[in-house]
Structures are given as C-alpha cells and as structure tokens.
Design a protein with these regions (language model features):
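Glycine/proline-rich active-site loop of Rossmann-fold NAD(P)-dependent oxidoreductases
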Residues: 146, 169-179, 215-225, 231, ...
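Conserved Rossmann-fold NAD(P)-dependent oxidoreductase catalytic core, especially the SDR/UDP-sugar
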Residues: 95-140
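Amphipathic terminal alpha-helices
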Residues: 293-296, 301-324
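Terminal hydrophobic/aromatic helix or amphipathic segment near a protein terminus
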Residues: 243-285
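NAD(P)H-binding glycine-rich loop region in Rossmannoid oxidoreductase-like domains
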Residues: 51-92
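Active-site Tyr-X1-5-Lys
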Residues: 136-161
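Substrate-positioning beta->alpha
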Residues: 99, 173-179, 193-216, 222-223
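N-terminal Rossmann NAD(P)H-binding glycine-rich loop of SDR-like oxidoreductase domains
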Residues: 3-23
Length: 324
C-alpha cells in the first residue's frame, strides 16, 4: 500500500510526507516542484509530473490499494495573473482534479483525502459556519474548489474525505503573511482593515496533517469537514501578539474598511495587487468555522493556537532572511 501525495512539495504536503514516513509508510510525491526539504528525497519516491497532464499521471501506475492525498492546487501564494484568473485556477484545481479522479477510477483506487478551502462559503450568513452552509464563493479560487468538490462527489464508489480548512499557517508558511512579517521585522506600521475586533480564525499545518491521518484511520468517510482553531483571538489581539513576540516597534493602524477596500480593488485591477478580492473582502469579518462535526466523527481537535502558529511562521521567516 502506497500513500500518494499530489502537490507533496508544497507547505502542507512536505509536513504530511514527513509524518507518513515517521509512521513507516511507503510514500510517493507527485509534483512539478522538487522538495525544499532535501532529507525527504532519500526517504520517499518522487515522481515528476503535472496534474494537468493525463500522461504524467500515468507514471504513478496507480493500484487499487493506494491512498491518494490530493493537495496539488493553484493558490493565491502563486503568481496569479492579472486577467483570466478563473481559467488559470480551473486548469489545475478542476481539470487536474478530474484527471486524478479518472486515473483512480480506471485503476480501482477508492481512497482519497482532498484539501478544499473555507473560501467555498464566501460571505457567510452567521458564525460559526457549519459544513451545510451554502457555498457562494467570492472569486475564482473558491469557485474552483467548489467545482473540484462536485467532481469528487460525482464518483459514487470513491471514499473521499474533503477538508475545508481556514487559512493554514505555521513554520514555513509565507504567501500573504510574508508582507505582514516584513513590516513587523522592519519596525514599520501595520495597516489593519477595520478596527480589528473581528475574529479571523486560522488553523495550523500540523493540525491539518493530523486531520488527514485521522481520515485514514477512520476509513475515509464520504464527508465534508471544517478545520479551524479553537477560541481564535481578535485580529487586533493576534497582530499585537506577533509584534510583541518579534520585539518589534511596529504598531497597528486601523483603516476603515469602506475606504480601503475600493483602493485595494483599484490596485488589483491595475496589476499592483496587495490583497486579492477574496482576501480583503472578508478581512474585517468574523470568519469562524464550526468544527463540531470533525471532532465527533474523526476524533479531531486542534492542538495549536493561532498565536502560536503565527509566531512560529514569523520565526521561520526571520531564519530564512538570515540565510539569504
């Protein structure tokens, strides 16, 4: 039995692979990028391939007893084009998903873990958000994940567990956080959309990996599960905690959402993107997921707080800067 990870060279993928190897499993990473952790190359099999290519996927030679963790995706951390964003996200997140599903079906491979996103919900009606909340994504990334979920559920013989995590953070995560950490490391003011009293929940990468392993342990229930931290702080509390941890002289500057959001929209349209619409639209909103279901059915509960995970991400950012 092999544990196959698509997109295993990414942030979550490498930590998942490391944990699977520690548990004595045979691991295969299917990705177009090499590992950043060189130690993983010696312990696992690497198959170079593009999820958009049916021929590349054939290199995996899928078997009925394989387990597929489908992490390959385009995200906002990548170089998102200024135009045709829907096609750009869909060719990997939707077409790529269809390709791996067809290969699994042909091989009789029936077990999958898929990481979707809470961005499938869009602007929410109430908090905390349960898994049966309507899916009304605000943009192309969330829409691509909704379509990927639909494809997965169309395969009736597939035992696929779908996770919808909040923003995944922890040591090694940058993306949008890199801009924040840079300001703090330089003791510069940190702008904040709104007054910071909203709770912007996150989830640690280690807790996400634990959830994937719990799905495996529980025979891959055909369910959708939210993933998020417990008792998230307010945005102001979170940012102040990181600034304090960094011994930075940075301070927060609240900016009225009604003023800054049109500015961010205009900057995005002319190619000077600071935040993408799907990001800034909810930055001043309460974003809390109900994790009751995953706790009850998988026995999963987060072990890492948002502040701890974000401080670990900041420390990692500083360590990387020191080596450059």
């Amino acid at each position: 039995m092999r544990h196959i990870i698509t997109g295993g060279s990414g942030f979550t993928g490498q930590i998942l692979i490391r944990k699977l190897l520690q548990n004595g499993n045979e691991v295969v990473n299917f990705d177009i990028k090499k590992y950043t952790d060189c130690t993983l190359e010696k312990q696992s099999q690497f198959v170079y391939g593009d999820i958009r290519s049916v021929q590349d996927i054939r290199k995996l030679n899928l078997q009925p007893d394989d387990i597929v963790y489908h992490l390959a995706a385009r995200q906002f951390a990548d170089n998102v084009p200024r135009s045709n964003r829907q096609a750009w996200f869909f060719e990997v997140n939707v077409t790529g998903t269809q390709n791996i599903l067809q290969a699994m079906s042909a091989a009789g491979t029936t077990r999958m873990v898929f990481f979707s996103t809470d961005m499938t919900y869009g602007m929410v009606n109430s908090c905390p958000v349960s898994e049966d909340h309507p899916q009304n994504p605000l943009g192309p990334y969330g829409s691509s994940k909704v379509e990927a979920e639909k494809l997965i559920r169309s395969y009736e013989k597939l035992n696929a567990t779908i996770f919808r995590p909040r923003l995944i953070t922890g040591a090694g995560r940058l993306g949008i956080l890199g801009k924040l950490f840079r300001l703090i490391s330089l003791n510069l003011p940190v702008p904040m959309i709104g007054n910071g009293t909203n709770r912007y929940q996150m989830v640690s990468v280690d807790d996400c990996v634990t959830a994937a392993l719990q799905a495996c342990k529980n025979n891959f229930p055909r369910e959708n599960f939210n993933l998020g931290s417990l008792n998230p702080p307010t945005t102001r509390e979170l940012l102040e905690a990181i600034i304090k941890h960094a011994n930075s002289k940075s301070f927060l500057i609240p900016v009225p959402a009604r003023l800054i959001k049109p500015v961010l929209s205009g900057l995005d349209k002319i190619g000077m993107t600071l935040l993408y619409p799907e990001q800034y639209a909810i930055a001043d909103q309460n974003t809390l997921l109900d994790i009751t279901k995953v706790n009850q059915l998988l026995g999963w509960s987060p072990s890492c707080s948002d502040i701890t995970a974000m401080c670990a991400a900041y420390d990692n950012y500083i360590n990387i800067k020191k080596t450059q």
